[in-house]
Amino acid sequence: MTDSVVRGFEDELSFIEKIDSVRYRVKKGFVPNMNVDGMIYVNDSIKDYLYEELEQYSKRGVSGFLPAVKQIANVASLPGIVGHSLGMPDIHSGYGFSIGNVAAFDTEDPLSIVSPGGVGFDINCGVRLLRTNLTEKDIEPIKEQLCQSLFDHVPVGVGSKGVIPMNIKTLNQALEMGVDWSLGEGYAWVEDKEHCEEYGRMLNADPTKVSERAKKRGLPQLGTLGAGNHYLEVQVVDEIYDKAAANKMGIDRQGQICIMIHSGSRGLGHQVATDSLTLMEKAMARDHIHLNDKQLACSRINSTEGQDYLSGMAAAANFAWVNRQSMTFLTRQAFAKAFNSTPDDLDMHVIYDVSHNIAKFEEHNVNGRPKKLLVHRKGATRAFAPHHPLIPVDYQFTGQPVLIGGTMGTCSYVLTGTELGMNETFGSTCHGAGRSCSRNKSRNNLSYTDVLDSLQAKGISIRVASPKLVMEEAPESYKDVVQVIETCHKAGISKKSVKLRPIAVIKG
């Protein structure tokens, strides 16, 4: 049942304690049955968004999703949670879990749960960054042609269909093998998988746990960008903060061209989440799981429903990695054609590929001893520290690259993981700017022609499949990504490395 405790705003604030300039504790008692405190990483300007949302809720009660602070607290009431229920600076309300929520559950506790709402509907929505040996001066004379070539090569938009040949047999292989399938089919370079989180393949994936309906939705969508906040951007290295880390990534100068691909598991992942939520809602009564919010539907990790979800989620995650790999292949083709060269000669190597929506078994220290945890990251990015065994050899001394997409027309960032982040946030940080208003409000308040004109005024070439959806993704709809990045940097949970400025945007 949805949390029914509605207090006055000042009473609500009495449960929120400022620890320092970027940390706020949400104390037990804020909602019923909290097992741990919440911890939210925000500075003063971002905090105002959360407080305003909470104040509106205090006056009017539930309308749509609960406020993000309430959602952080409700997650803190879930069985088996350890540490804190964590909110990153780009936090905003979502389905069950807020977007920007990180929560870890002790696998030794038989009551611990897995929740699809803690991963999200777009399983393994994530970002990939490629570098090149090109500069902005190389791009400028043919920028419009390149933009059009990318738009022509990479299928975009709500109903877009992929150009990668796929049948149900090869789909099942892709669901099981991830980027290993792409490698076997000639869509990947050997070193591409080395620079992917999980090496582009979750080994617990089981295609039989993905419904026929989900497969039917995913079959035509492999190698497609989709719509919403997904994009392909040509970017310029605008600033280098950490030369050693940047050099390890193959970024060695301002003006260098990179390409960022932001996409996920499309309709297949959405259906996996929907199917699991339906099954878990039925299983909760059997397992005597009582929730503050029914959107937190979950199952014990070791239950049939929990294991089936994790296997299906892993398969959907593999689909997303194959999807980004397929678009990498198409992007390399577009650049090679535009510059009458080869992707290899253009040095189009993958810097890294990260997931923003996923649940994974990881080992972390809890109260001074190592524990195997199921870490849910929803709208958050893994950010492992230097010397961690799960990051590539190339990044052992600098920490894992963390890819943070800005809003349409604003800068993106590459960060690196830190030891403090390992200790405080289970090696996690932010994932983007984070919405500041709803899609509906954006559509009502903004004109798509104004948004497109604004991008062109900044010298950004753009191709959009659905121009009228552009308002939803306008910078005005989001928090300031600079504030988000600076908050994470100041908190020490990730470290700034590179700033990237967009010069061409492809959107659905």
UniProtKB/Swiss-Prot annotation:
Mn(2+) 1 binds at D122, C125, H230. It holds the Pfam family RtcB. Its EC number is 6.5.1.8. The keyword Ligase applies. Mn(2+) 2 binds at C125, H262, H356. It catalyses: a 3'-end 3'-phospho-ribonucleotide-RNA + a 5'-end dephospho-ribonucleoside-RNA + GTP = a ribonucleotidyl-ribonucleotide-RNA + GMP + diphosphate; a 3'-end 2',3'-cyclophospho-ribonucleotide-RNA + a 5'-end dephospho-ribonucleoside-RNA + GTP + H2O = a ribonucleotidyl-ribonucleotide-RNA + GMP + diphosphate + H(+). Catalytic subunit of the tRNA-splicing ligase complex that acts by directly joining spliced tRNA halves to mature-sized tRNAs by incorporating the precursor-derived splice junction phosphate into the mature tRNA as a canonical 3',5'-phosphodiester. May act as an RNA ligase with broad substrate specificity, and may function toward other RNAs. PANTHER family: RNA-SPLICING LIGASE RTCB HOMOLOG. This is RNA-splicing ligase RtcB homolog.
